[in-house]
Amino acid sequence: MSDDRFAEDEIIQQRRKRRLEILKKYQQTGNGHSDLSIPEKKLKEDVDQVSTTKPIEAVPKMKTNASKIEINKEGSNSNTKLDVTNSTTSDSPSIKSSVQIEDTEDDMFADSPSPSVKRQNTGKGISTLTRSFADMQDNWDDIEGYYKVVLMEELDSRYIVQSNLGKGMFSTVVSALDRNRNQTFAIKIIRNNEVMYKEGLKEVSILERLQAADREGKQHIIHYERHFMHKNHLCMVFEMLSLNLRDILKKFGRNVGLSIKAVRLYAYQMFMALDLLKQCNVIHSDIKPDNMLVNEKRNILKICDLGSASDASENEITPYLVSRFYRAPEIILGFPYSCPIDTWSVGCSLYELYTGQILFPGRTNNQMLRYMMECKGKFSHKMLKRSQFLNDHFDADFNFIQIDHDPITNQETRKPVKFSKPTKDIRSRLKEVPTSTDEEFIIRQELMDLLEKCLELNPEKRVPPEVALKHPFFIKK
């Protein structure tokens, strides 16, 4: 059996090869770079066909009392910015770890574009990304189907492109000024091929379901405006939020984390979003700090990028769903999964926000399982027996098989490792984070308990979002 890392790389290469084959096919048939937009009526029909779930009634509001954390007071009506800085933050500069760099290399929500898409100054004050429209005729896409962004181009007869925000696996994201409303929006431009188009329609369908259930926009999912076609690309318009939690961590809590009150505020809003997702029967499937945006005052959080989201009934078993550091154990093991995978991702994200460190920085799925058992103890035999990928990581006696790669012999090494009790549990790790007041110490104890419940190895025992919202961690002291 090959190392997980090489297996994952091979899968990624195969996907890239398939994408190139699809693009070549469309170039040959003349569909790959068509300047003709799909009519809006046809687009709506396509979205309706993709939707597999009937509209649901609005989600009932969470009942809170005066003793709960004052989200509204610290929310959009506040005139002051949230102080997210950890009072124990060191002033000394630090270097980003290699695992953090690797995880954000090709992420559209990282703090800056990857080196391959960064703009360069020409010396004349004009970005090299600005191109002549005459040069772009019949050549609007690159070889992989990404739209070639043109600054000051008009989209859908109303949006003026202001800047290129970044590029991900499925799309390019730009900021654009809406002339009709004199307001800036983020526009997600899906890659030009049939597979990406259908995935984009699926995302539109899910976004519309979520908005139908949250008409007042209080459940902390990114606000979706509308969609349209441009040069054969599906485009989705979203509210503009310029910062994500990765940015916040780098700026205010690099390697030391944020203040526990900031973590508490963000955590409550995360679980509000999870509650909406669960009631709509939607799995986000890619929750991480990069995919949680905040406003300028840093007191409102919204979960974004539902490109990997799906209906809970479509949970196909695959070992590489969700970004690796935030990947729940049931995904790696091939155990039936549902909405609790998002709760696991939130737990990992909250630990990272408070400590400034990635909780499970495994470079392979096998390493991820080892780190999880060091933190939470061994998996139950009952859970392992129901896992499709059991033999990839455990022997016949349910002993974990640690897989490493010998750099000298270039061979895979395998050795059994027995786990019983946790050796690096959540509580012992968080105790290393200093507290400045008795109040902060008490709140930290409650955070420990909440994280333990979010990170249950068995998803059936993991805390549901509606229960998490009532946890003592959110009771105002």
From Swiss-Prot:
EC number annotated for this UniProt entry: 2.7.11.1
UniProt-listed GO biological process terms: mRNA cis splicing, via spliceosome; positive regulation of mRNA cis splicing, via spliceosome; signaling
Biased composition (Polar residues): 74-86, 113-123
Keyword entries, A-Z: ATP-binding, Kinase, mRNA processing, mRNA splicing, Nucleotide-binding, Phosphoprotein, Serine/threonine-protein kinase, Transferase
SMART domains cross-referenced by the UniProt entry: S_TKc (SM00220)
Pfam families, alphabetized: Pkinase
Compositional bias per record (Low complexity), positions renumbered to this chain: 87-98
Residue intervals of the Protein kinase domain: 159-477
Residue list for modification Phosphoserine: S92
GO MF entries: ATP binding; protein kinase activity; protein serine kinase activity; protein serine/threonine kinase activity
Function, in words: Has a role in pre-mRNA splicing and is essential for growth. Phosphorylates srp1.
Protein name: Serine/threonine-protein kinase prp4
